[in-house]
């Protein structure tokens, strides 16, 4: 009888893990809530390409001739997607020298 109770508790514990699966984290989309022009200008201007890829990941579009990386930003709350933004990082001498968000 004691073994049945232990088995039942183990099953309940493992099945409760699937409840937390509703709030998935999407790694493919950067959240724009934490990025504004002051933060970008203060922290990311002057960084190298390798540092940007380490922080933001591989860009969705990279113009090899124009030295521009494009990142897709989205705000989401309660499964509602709010206006989407594009973060464009411009490189000069392998360092970020300007950016814009559209």
From Swiss-Prot:
GO cellular component: Bam protein complex
GO biological process terms held by the UniProt record: Gram-negative-bacterium-type cell outer membrane assembly; protein insertion into membrane
Family the UniProt entry places it in: Belongs to the BamE family.
Gene3D superfamilies assigned to the protein according to its UniProt record, in alphabetical order: 3.30.1450.10
Pfam family, one: BamE
Protein localization: Cell outer membrane
Protein name as catalogued: Outer membrane protein assembly factor BamE
């Amino acid at each position: 009888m004691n073994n049945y109770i232990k088995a039942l508790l183990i099953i309940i514990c493992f099945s409760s893990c699937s409840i937390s699966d509703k709030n998935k984290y999407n790694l493919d989309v950067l959240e724009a809530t934490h990025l504004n022009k002051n933060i970008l200008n203060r922290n990311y201007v002057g960084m190298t390409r390798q540092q940007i890829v380490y922080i933001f990941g591989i860009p969705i579009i990279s113009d090899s001739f124009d030295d521009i990386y494009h990142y897709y930003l989205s705000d989401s709350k309660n499964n509602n997607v709010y206006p989407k933004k594009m973060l464009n990082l411009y490189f000069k001498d392998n360092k970020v020298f300007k950016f814009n968000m559209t």
